[in-house]
From Swiss-Prot:
Gene Ontology annotations for the cellular component aspect, listed alphabetically: cytoplasm
First-listed, main subcellular location of the protein, grouped into a coarse class: cytoplasm
Gene that encodes it: ndk
One BP term from GO: UTP biosynthetic process
One MF annotation (Gene Ontology) recorded for this entry: nucleoside diphosphate kinase activity
Protein name as it appears in the record: Nucleoside diphosphate kinase
Any Pfam family matching the protein: NDK
NCBIfam families linked to this entry: PRK00668.1
Top-level EC class as recorded in UniProt: transferase
Amino acid sequence: MMTERTFSIIKPDVVKRNLIGAILTRFEQNGFKIIASKMVRLTREQAEGFYAEHQGKEFFVPLVEYMMSSPIVVSVLEKENAVKDYRTLIGTTNPETAAEGTIRKDFALSQRENSVHGSDSIESANREIAYFFTNSEIFER
């Protein structure tokens, strides 16, 4: 097995409820190393750029507004099978259908306020990591 990296966003609903530590703890309890992490406040340009693939969809504007509503925590996580394992850990987009014990089942407020974002492929992870982090901000552990 090869060690992979994935990208995570702890979204505004978690930050506003002061649950950042609970989410980061879940990452570590599930074998992920946090090799980069920072809190950022997205500008409209950053939010629209990050979610550009959804431009024109009905949920795009509300999603951008939501992601700008509070600071977020962006992180790079590392472990074997990081992308797949992270997707399993966070659960489905809709918390009502997410499996018991997943982050979204336990923390999400709604399908939009679903607590976390996770890359859906290694290619997406690499692109999303580069969107928020320079190589000098990522640390081997």
